[in-house]
C-alpha cells in the first residue's frame, strides 16, 4: 500500500475536486482499508495501473501573494460545522488569497463531518490544503499506521509539499500515536517518524537555498509544558 504524489512546482497548478481539494496524488491500496471501523477508509483500488499520470496546468504565480491559514475549527456536530461556515467562511468569500490551509483538528473526532465542512470551505473558491491533527485520526485504529485511513480517503497523503511563487510549503504529520503500557489505549505525542524524516531530507535537497521554506504542521515544534 502506498500513496504516490507529485510535488507541485512553481508556476503550475494541479486539478481540484468539487470541494477545492487539490488532486495531486494517487492512492494505491489493492485491498483497501481494514473494514469494521466506524469511519470509512479507502475502498479497494485493485492492481496498480500501467501508468499513473498527474496533470499540471500553467499559471502565473507572483512573488508576493496572500494565503489563508486557520487551525482547530474542531466542529463536533453539524450545528458547529454551520458555525464555521457562517462565522468564518462567509467572511472570506471573495478573498484575493491564492490558496488556504487548515492546520489540523479539522474535526473533533467525528470524521463523518469532513464532507459537510469541505463543501462549506469550497465556497471560498480557492484551492484548500489540509494538515492532519490529533482529532482527525480514527481512534478505533489498532496502530498508528492505520490511524489516518479516513483522512487519506478524503485528503490524500498526510505529508507532502508544494511550491507557490518563491516559497516551498511542506505539510507534515507530526501526530505520533502509541499504545499505553498495557498495550490497549492509544495516546499521542508530537514527533516525526523515520519515513517522514527521510521524505523531508530528500525534499529539501532539491529546494534552492534562497527559497523561503514554510513548515505546516499541527503540534507546535516547541512547547512550554
PLM region spans:
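N-terminal active-site segment of His-dependent metallophosphoesterases
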Residues: 33-114
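Active-site-proximal beta-strand elements of phosphoester/diester hydrolases
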Residues: 64-74, 166-176, 214-216
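Divalent metal-coordination and catalytic microenvironments
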Residues: 72, 100, 105, 133, ...
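Catalytic metal-binding/acid-base residues of hydrolase active sites
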Residues: 74, 106-107, 135-136, 175, ...
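Long, structured stretches of catalytic cores involved in phosphate-ester chemistry, encompassing
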Residues: 209-225
